[in-house]
């Protein structure tokens, strides 16, 4: 009798005990994917004005255009040994300087907070355009080093992520897709391989719109500043690559850290990129995988690669898994090294490149055979 009573009393406890793992998982998700991003960005806002940032350069470039001055330094004015804490010359295409005019009208303290909010909104909107609705995916993204680094320095990388995501969403609308690809390629030159995605998927009208809009946009923006800096621009980019390329995380930097000369290291990166383009064109099919390959090639060929560039990896991740999965946690591994310049350390460079390659590889594997997301007409 007592045995039956004991069994009866213990029976209701079994379902309760079984619910503990699920409850613990939900609590962990709320803490690490909900509360942690909020704490990170509260800290960021509190310390925003105490750190030099890319946004300072953008704001100054907009002010220069506003007052009729060139935003570009001369190649000869760049220091032989740049200080990683203060070296941030404006070297973007002039479209970026013209785009910063509205923010340059604001006081710097106001403008930098506005731009931080724009960066965060761009990440959220990009994920939404990619069809992501699971809140845990947003939490994982906002906890990641690439997103935090982008917001922390005031980089335009989240806006590039948004541009690529929108190009995917409107990929079968020639004018919209073309204009969006032109925007990302002219705002940050290393993303030009995204244009090849349009060509490889036979979206020739969109590719033509992108090419025409890119040329018109760059020439129009340069005309707006009186073509200041146009003659020296190639030399400026070359000098910047020689100065800070070896300090970044690019394959070019890895080659330099292993003793290759500048020309040899850059040629090796270009050859590797060309081989990757040929392999992708031959072996891969489907919009998802080809866009992922285009972004991978972009990161492979750029001579300068900073951690915040890697925010574009959320396009392949979202195209592989629209709901939360371990793949969404992969970019958290980039927290192993977010200190900025590498000082030419091959171990640091190789570690970040290996994590990048692994993330792209996992996304490609999980994209295989999936149906395409709906196309916005």
Identify the role of each PLM range:
Residues 181-198, 302-309:
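Transmembrane helices and adjacent periplasmic/lumenal helix-loop junctions
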Residues 215, 325-337, 352-357, 376:
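Signature aromatic-anchored transmembrane alpha helix within multi-pass, membrane-resident enzymes
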Residues 2-177, 201-322, 336-338, 342, ...:
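Primarily membrane-embedded glycan-assembly and transfer machineries that use lipid-linked glycans
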Residues 186-189, 216-220, 326:
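Membrane-embedded alpha-helical segments of transport systems
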Residues 342-355:
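Loop-to-transmembrane alpha-helix initiation sites
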């Amino acid at each position: 009798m007592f045995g039956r009573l004991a069994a009866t009393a213990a029976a209701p406890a079994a379902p309760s005990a079984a619910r503990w793992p699920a409850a613990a998982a939900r609590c962990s998700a709320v803490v690490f994917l909900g509360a942690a991003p909020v704490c990170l960005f509260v800290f960021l806002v509190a310390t925003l004005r105490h750190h030099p940032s890319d946004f300072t350069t953008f704001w100054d470039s907009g002010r220069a255009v506003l007052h009729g001055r060139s935003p570009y330094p001369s190649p000869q004015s760049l220091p032989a040994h740049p200080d990683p804490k203060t070296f941030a010359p404006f070297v973007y295409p002039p479209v970026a300087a013209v785009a910063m005019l509205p923010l340059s009208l604001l006081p710097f303290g106001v403008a930098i907070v506005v731009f931080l909010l724009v960066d965060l909104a761009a990440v959220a909107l990009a994920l939404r355009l990619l069809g992501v609705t699971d809140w845990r995916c947003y939490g994982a993204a906002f906890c990641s080093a690439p997103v935090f680094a982008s917001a922390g320095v005031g980089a335009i990388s989240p806006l590039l992520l948004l541009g690529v995501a929108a190009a995917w969403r409107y990929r079968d609308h020639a004018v919209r897709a073309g204009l969006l690809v032109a925007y990302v390629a002219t705002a940050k030159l290393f993303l030009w391989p995204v244009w090849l995605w349009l060509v490889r998927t036979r979206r020739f009208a969109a590719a033509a719109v992108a090419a025409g809009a890119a040329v018109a946009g760059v020439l129009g923006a340069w005309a707006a500043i009186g073509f200041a800096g146009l003659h020296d621009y190639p030399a400026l980019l070359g000098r910047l690559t020689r100065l800070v390329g070896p300090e970044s995380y690019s394959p070019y930097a890895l080659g330099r850290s292993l003793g290759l000369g500048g020309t040899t290291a850059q040629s090796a990166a270009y050859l590797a990129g060309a081989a990757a383009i040929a392999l992708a064109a031959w072996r891969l099919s489907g919009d998802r995988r080809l866009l992922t390959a285009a972004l991978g090639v972009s990161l492979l060929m750029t001579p300068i690669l900073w951690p915040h560039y890697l925010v574009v990896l959320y396009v392949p991740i979202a195209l592989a898994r629209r709901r939360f999965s371990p793949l969404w946690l992969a970019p958290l591994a980039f927290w192993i090294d977010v200190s900025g310049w590498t000082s030419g350390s091959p171990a640091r460079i190789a570690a970040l490149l290996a994590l990048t390659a692994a993330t792209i590889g996992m996304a490609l594997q999980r994209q295989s055979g999936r149906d395409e997301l709906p196309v916005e007409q």
